[in-house]
UniProtKB/Swiss-Prot annotation:
Disulfide bonds: none annotated. GO terms for molecular function: 2 iron, 2 sulfur cluster binding; dihydroxy-acid dehydratase activity; magnesium ion binding. Mg(2+) binds at residues 78, 120-121, 439. Its EC number is 4.2.1.9. Keywords: 2Fe-2S, Amino-acid biosynthesis, Branched-chain amino acid biosynthesis, Iron, Iron-sulfur, Lyase, Magnesium, Metal-binding. The gene is ilvD. This is Dihydroxy-acid dehydratase.
Amino acid sequence: MRSDEVKKGIDRVAHRALLKALGVTDDEMDKPFIGVANAYNTIVPGHMTLDKLTQAVKEGVYAAGGVPFEFGIIGICDGIAMGHEGMCFSLPSRELVADTIEAMVEAHRFDGLVVVASCDKIIPGMLMAMLRLNIPAIAVTGGPMPYERVGGEKVSIKDAFEAAGMYKAGKLDDAGLKLYEDYCAPYCGSCQGLYTANSMQILTETLGLSLPYCSTSPCPSSRKLRIAKQSGKRVVELVMQNIKPLDFVNERSFENAITMDMLVGGSTNTVLHLPAIAKEAGIRLSLDLFDEISRRTPHIVSIDPASKEMVVDLDESGGVPMLIKKARKYFHDEMTVSGKTLYEIAEMAVLRGRDIIASPDNPLHKEGGIAILKGNLAENGAVIKAAAVSEDMMRFEGTAKVYDSEKEALNAILDGKVEEGDVVVIRYMGPKGAPGMPEMLLPTAAISGLGLQKVALITDGRFSGATRGPCIGHVSPEAAVGGNIALVEDGDKISIDIPARKLEVKLSDEELAERRAKWKPKEKELKGYLAKYAKLVRGAEEGAALL
């Protein structure tokens, strides 16, 4: 066992003494040592009960004959970090999560690993670490937050973000605003809709790195505790059988994850995270592959922000196993950490409530929920959640209103300076430019809350999974490195054609060249982690991974 390097032999007397200081007994020195990476904290709603899940994991490890060692991992709440400088740290924290898990596991020579997390960047960071380390490992994801109702309607955190615009437009009074504040995040768990956290939990299960139903089992449920305990038992079995993630996660597994992403209309952030995770396995996922799979995969379930259905409703409909069962022909039958293949898991699917999953033969949309756009405004690509765009906005031409910061754009929107027919352009928000590629949820929520139906938004930054409407992100090359988005001016005409996958500014090559000759990069004073990150980060089309 790997852990023998810290517990066996005469020259490890001091090591054993330190382990005994923790309460490790002589007989436990012969058992597998299992690291349990716990992202519990009391600032992230999706993480505030991970201590209980981690306890269940450790009980499972003990029951199966292993010795668990828990260690802490950071976790940022994207919702609380939204709309201020803190959002610049969200995406970069993914790499910190991966690196710190790697450091802890390698330093202490754990035989196996369980990662416990719920939210946006923490899950991808943990999966990156699992594949990088390639020791027996399993993921336990915290599960979705249940919803409450306001005015008889289901509400989610998306509604709270949009409430500010509704209030500004006179659609809500003070009492109504308070209701949204009090009931849009009523429980523990990852925010209710198919935003980034729940999208990544579903893709983790599809990749085969968590047990069946782990992703959609609600945060407060006893089923979640049982899955956590089973995961603790399973990791010990994986150690005994020497089954490592890269023994079953391969290119076809990632194709399955992209397919699932398209079937459900997941967050556009998955287009950043999956390539970064795959890179740790030596696999390259191009934007072209995402678009190729999107074109051949139907969209069969509509979940908030695209509808009023929530992830707990998907769980009642059978979760990931039922999605695979209904859309079996679109998936490769790959092995999973459970010891069962995807097809075998699909046969376990149980419908417990309403069925919100359409048949692939009669889908909601013939193509997948995410589209990759290219053109002179995004030569390396841009991303849009097509599943959350109304039919009449699939093709749109509008007038550019250009802003070099989120705050500037948000103020203009709330002050009524953005009108129907406009295309809001927010630039210098990319991986290097911001840096950290912050999410632009507040401007998009303001547009929705104000009831603006014919306004698009384009950025080299990102969007929250809660964003809906014609919002195009990840524009690459970004403004900070001289991408054409840096050359757009107020009044330019911008054309969006989602079916044709086109994103164009109506300027000739000569006009762009003339503007480029006058362009100068913006200098930004950076310090600490973000200064290092800005130097090392790659473009959005490469998952904003570090060199």
